[in-house]
Amino acid sequence: MWKGLERDENTEIQSSNESYIDDYNHYYICFFNPIIINGCLAKLLSFDSQRTEVYKDTDITHYQWYIGKNAKKEYADKWGMDESIFPESITDNMDVLDYKMVYYNPWDAQYLSYLVVEYDDKSYEEEIQRLEQYDSKEYKGYFGTRGFRDKYRLLAIEVDPDHGLIYALEEENNQIIYVELIFCNYFYDIDYQDEIDIQYLPIGFDATPDNEYHQKRLNQ
């Protein structure tokens, strides 16, 4: 009887030791195998990206939360780009016809905004003058951009070769369209074409992840 009991106890000890070894091997593989570490990290990044929501706001009364010197912290510095092409604030002489702000930040912040304003005659001329005095940058070739549609006249444009474009377009009926397309490292992670009227986008503009401009910059 005692011998049988000894065999049972030894079996339990052996089983316990085997379990310990299995646990050790498991943790060794998880923490010290680079391939598995990279795989786990990739899954973690993917999971975090999926949990990050695209934030959108179309309420014009929130305009100064996102644009100008009084913008909230996460919108105050958009990769160092100068967004003074946009109006500093919304005033009584502006009839806002359309507005949208999109923000996405899974790891690197991305912004898309547009504002369509109809001005009275006097204010329209003043705004045209302000924008024409802006130190506009050469933009063709960046992100595939070739120009703008014939119905618009480009009034001012800011360009960053890594982070995007900010510009203003003149349309008929005293209307001006302001657009900012700001992202990190040559492309958007959002479906930006679903967020803005494509008529407002430059001809040839491509900020999808596999865009040709992105590939050229990586190969430089």
Where are these regions (language model features)?
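Polar low-complexity intrinsically disordered regions enriched in Ser/Thr and small residues
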Residues: 7, 71, 83, 144-147
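Acidic/proline-rich low-complexity IDRs
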Residues: 4, 40-44, 96, 154, ...
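Cytosolic-side transmembrane helix boundary signature
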Residues: 1-24
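Hydrophobic membrane-insertion alpha-helices, especially the h-region
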Residues: 20-39, 43
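Extracytoplasmic electrostatic interaction patches
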Residues: 127-220
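N-terminal export/targeting and maturation segments
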Residues: 35-119, 123
